[in-house]
Amino acid sequence: MRKRNAGIKPSQRFAELRALRQAGKTRASTYESKENEELYDNVSEEEYRKIVRQRLDEDDFVVDDNGAGYVDNGYDEWDQSHYSDEDDENEKGSSGRKRKKSKNVLAEPNQQIGAFFKANAIQPASRIANRKNNEKEDEFMAEILGSIDQDIPERLSTKKGNRSHTTSNAKRRSQKAASSISTTNVVSSDPKKYIPETVPSTPQPASSLPIPSSPPAALETEENVDSQPMELDEPELPVGSDAPIIDVEESIAMKPLMSHDQVDDTASLSKATISQQPLSPMTPLSSELDVSAFSEINSKIKNVDVPASSYSSPISKVSPSDVTEEDGSLFFFWMDYTEMYGSLCLFGKVYDKATKQYVSCFLKVDGIMRSLYFLPRPSSSSVSEDSIAAQTKDVYDEVANLLSKRGVKEWKSRVSKYKYAFELEDVPRTADYLEVIYSYSYPALPTDLTGSSFSHVFGTNTALFEQFVLSRRVMGPCWLKIQQPNFDAVKNASWCRVEIGCSSPQNISVSFEKNEITSKTPPMTVMSLAFRTLINKEQNKQEVVMISARIFENVDIEKGLPANDMPSYSFSLIRPLKQIFPNGFEKLARQHKSSIFCERSEVSLLNNFLNKVRTYDPDVYFGHDFEMCYSVLLSRLKERKIHNWSSIGRLRRSEWPRSFNRSSQQFVEKQIIAGRLMCDLSNDFGRSMIKAQSWSLSEIVLKELDIKRQDINQEKALQSWTDTAHGLLDYLVHCEIDTFFIAAVAFKIQMLQLSKNLTNIAGNSWARTLTGTRAERNEYILLHEFKKNGYIVPDKQQSIRRHAEAFGAEDGLQEESLGKKKDKYKGGLVFEPQKGLYETCILVMDFNSLYPSIIQEYNICFTTVDRSPSNSDSDDQIPDTPSASANQGIFPRLIANLVERRRQIKGLLKDNSATPTQRLQWDIQQQALKLTANSMYGCLGYTKSRFYARPLAVLITYKGREALMNTKELADQMGLQVIYGDTDSVMLNTNVTDKNHALRIGNEFKEKVNERYSKLEIDIDNVYQRMLLHAKKKYAALQLDSQGKPNLDVKGLDMKRREFCTLAKEASKFCLDQILSGELTETVIENIHSYLMDFSEKMRNGKFPANKFIIFNRLGKNPEDYPNGKTMPFVQVALKKKARGENVRVGDVIPFIIAGSDADGHPADRAYSPQEIMNTNSTLVIDYNYYLSHQILPPIERVIAPIEGTNRARLAECLGLDARKYYSHETSESSAFQRYESTLTDDQCFINVSPLLLKCPSCNATSFSLRSVKSLKETLYANTVECDCGYEYSDFTIILQFSSQLRDFINLYYEGILVCDDSSCGNRTRQMSVYGKRCCNKSCRGSVHFEYNDEQLYNQIKFLLKAVQTTTGATRNGIIRCNAINKNISRIMNKNAREFVDMGLIFSS
């Protein structure tokens, strides 16, 4: 940029000064003010807006800018700062003055032009003006360079010149943004203090952006380079730029913008000669991170070049003529919705005929009316046409007055006849209602509103979306036909390519036409995301440091292709995890096969990510733990005040929605993302499709893809691995590979297909189905069915709890989090199991879909069952079943329709001529139909459902118990033994060993049962060769498949629970295999004992990997809310994770490992995350004794319990545990008769006492651990009691230590801690159940007892007295010592009531 008067030569100025001096004048006296030229045109507001519109109509002035942000919005950038010379002068000035800087506030789009000319100048952020002396600065720079690479040569001093002005304004703005980031004292905010002046051996271009297919020309001549020495700037990345991704099979060498020679020849940085030496090789990454594992996977991913369409402007609109039909209508496939100011906003896709692509579309539907139904009060006079008319007139007048008071100016009404069949007792089955409709822009009426002329009003809180789909009969995502679309009604309201307005829902109808456009679901654009965050310890907030995305375009969800067969392209965004990137990282990033964008700050990273989202315009997000990551992302967008933050969804927003509490915060987050579906592998819906323990990404990938994903310690990675260029790149690639894993799992389990089919059946929202709301699906399918048949449907109950659950967890978790609920009615029948080992064939006879079949069998429906108060005297009264002549109810007809549709589809699956795509579609459809039909009963018994009907649920379960009991009686009549039965199945002991013979018996039994019913049907579910039946819902058996091959089938045992580690499950499985092997009992017991001894030896020698010791527990509530959380290991681990800033929420499965020993405290204090244990630098040692006694022994003991020949003490001995601790337990359990205590020896009496310790005051070592009376006597009877260090214990010290230990035991007794005798429960509490000894845990059937009872305390005190009361054989000093101890301890024993027996109290009666 030229300076003013740059054309005047210095010689001319000197001549002018000499002339003035000779004349005796000065320049100030001769200065004349010149009239400046007009810099701006004075125009009116209307003229300025016209100019802006003309600019918008013009083409972009930058062609193919790779999405770098050169988009003209038509307005002048009055409020944006640009680089100028003054910026550098301000930075370099030595003045210590601090300037006040104003914030860079973006102008509102609709501001008047005068608002753009405010005097608030936008200036750079304030900087610290203090300078250090040269010596300190040299030391500081040496430290910085040394931290980057130890082999960089010593810096030579160079003359500092002015900064080059060839950098673009965009780059300067980026530099300012980077310099404004809060930094620590390691790197100063002054750029000159941290930019190295030494030239690296490998020069880096000005941009670390991956090179586009047509790279700009390299600098070749000296005119292109500033002659002044310049400081090295860190390479910048233009926001929003893209680059082609290299195909795996075609490796293309990436060329830098300037070669090494060109830099040496044209860009000399100083007149002084600088010796350049190659940098030392990067430090290899820790061996803990197996780079080859995911590098091999990354090389096999089918990456493609970024298509040219991705470089086009993401906001380009589509012409209306390209999306409409000849008659002016439009086909629109809707996917998601949101509600805004009384209008329904639908998001979906339309077909662009010009590009022959499906593009995103936004449809704003106005004119949807709220429908209210006023029920007139019953008249006491005789019913006549005149009285009915008068009554209706009264209701009309009262409603008109009511609406007028509430500001409703426009409304319509009519009298309509509707039916009602639900739980309000005073609502007649059929009645005339005053139907009132008015716009949703007016406020809603209260739900409990009544009047003098009407008793009820229905529909006051009906949601806008519900009103639309019910009135237009829209059943989930489908093609809609829009008549009279208005393309001018909506402008820039969304981020979609097409925006349409529709004035009335009457212009929208479901399209049943099958043409080229509407014959299938449009292809989707899927973006799979993975995030990495770190904790800002100063602010205690999570910050985003890395985002990786993988884009799959034109995904046909109906074909069900695996991720490997679909082309994709990926990009990653990363910012420095510390102050700067490791030296050489940006060069590695440019050479990486997929695009890596190195951003300078979190702000630029988030801006670039949103720019990518707008460019690719994804329809669906894939993620793992995405709901939590999405919440963090939104918080960072809001915290950093990112412009266009709403583009994470598809609705443009200028203000953040307000949230008042946690539940509404979740609601707000879902509203922001509206328009783009969220598929989360770890939410309720994802978990319902994947059987796993912890639902971690590694476990899911191993189970579904059979690929071992390497878990990494995030904390360690951020601290050490990312210090080197290669380490940071490997860390990034690990995140990048996760995007493929997430997408591959989601595509394999058919997440999109199944959720769409479920939504089409229920008629609700696709996005809501993806959150796992099963209860809402049941509600919507009933709403559609009853509304279609002319019924008034129940209103949705409005309460704080219901609103909190609107976007919360699924039913089971809600119940758990809200507290223990008492049984609402009697459930299914469960027979008492005939425990034991069965060597003959066992048949499992199962009723197919018992409850749906009962609903059809007995015609149970809201419309058929009489639930009036006169017919039900109490809550437990069973309603009568409808008569056989009653018309089929809506509920059974709906279920019959679902069952019949599934039967037809299963018939299609048998067609061998069907294509794989057809078979996949049919299979998904039959799964969706089965899930829907089987879950319909749940809405009747779910108290928070709109269709909750307790009498119907009671009747259905009663008929289920009746059917099971009748089945048992029939088996008894046929001479078959029913060994167990549960709700919808019975187990029959056939007393034969041949499978075919057992099947013949089962078929005969099946025929006799099925002939009793028309809809109920029983069938043979399983044939077990051998079976070990433990308890209710707990058994193991060898299941015979169709070829007669046995497979182990386990239900309810400990090896199926996540609370037991892998080693416990392996040991239990071995024991089960032995028991079910058919060998002799003696051989089985001998093999188990040998295995356990070998198992214990291997564990104590560290032969098992640490990951087999991981225990899982699920959080039922927030970790802070557990009253006994201090004694629960998983709660303590969860609290530690929260303290580190990690995300922990209700429902998470917490993994942990117990380390240390009993001497280190309670197991809860010794619980650590697996990463802490498996860290190569960790000094923690796994507590093998804890695992053997609490994880291995209890499940094995329960497995072997029905087998004779061993006991708990013997099993403990095989595991290397102290068998003496288990003898008393075995005796108390096995025998009702016990010996008198007076007949027991000292060893038998004091087998369970704790040892008494003597700790040396001199060396702090435990000198004596006295475990028996014999050892006590040997120590105390001696002449002196000495420590190994030579310290001699005084009698006073011994008495004090013994007394202190006994007081600890007394305190332990008075704590009154109760423990459950069921080792699988492990409950430990001070709370006592109202049922006495019953365990407080809901799912436990064990009994509680005192952890430390009065007998144990008595024996502990008696243990010491036994040794000191008699002094036979003691030395003189020993006698004195024992007498002193006896005197003090006897005082304690005299206070123990167990010592004395009150004979008078015994014989007083």
UniProtKB/Swiss-Prot annotation:
Residues 176-188 have a biased composition (Polar residues). One of its GO terms (biological process) is DNA repair. SUPFAM superfamilies: DNA/RNA polymerases (SSF56672), Ribonuclease H-like (SSF53098). Its main location: nucleus. It is found in: Nucleus. It catalyses: DNA(n) + a 2'-deoxyribonucleoside 5'-triphosphate = DNA(n+1) + diphosphate. A motif (CysB motif) lies at residues 1316-1340. Zn(2+) 2 binds at C1316, C1321, C1335, C1340. InterPro entries: DNA-dir_DNA_pol_B, DNA-dir_DNA_pol_B_CS, DNA-dir_DNA_pol_B_exonuc, DNA-dir_DNA_pol_B_multi_dom, DNA/RNA_pol_sf, DNA_pol_a_cat_su_N, DNA_pol_B_thumb, DNA_pol_palm_dom_sf. One of its GO terms (molecular function) is chromatin binding. SMART domains: POLBc. The keyword Lipoprotein does not apply. Belongs to the DNA polymerase type-B family. NCBIfam families: pol2 (TIGR00592). This is DNA polymerase alpha catalytic subunit. The lineage of its organism: Eukaryota, Fungi, Dikarya, Ascomycota, Taphrinomycotina.
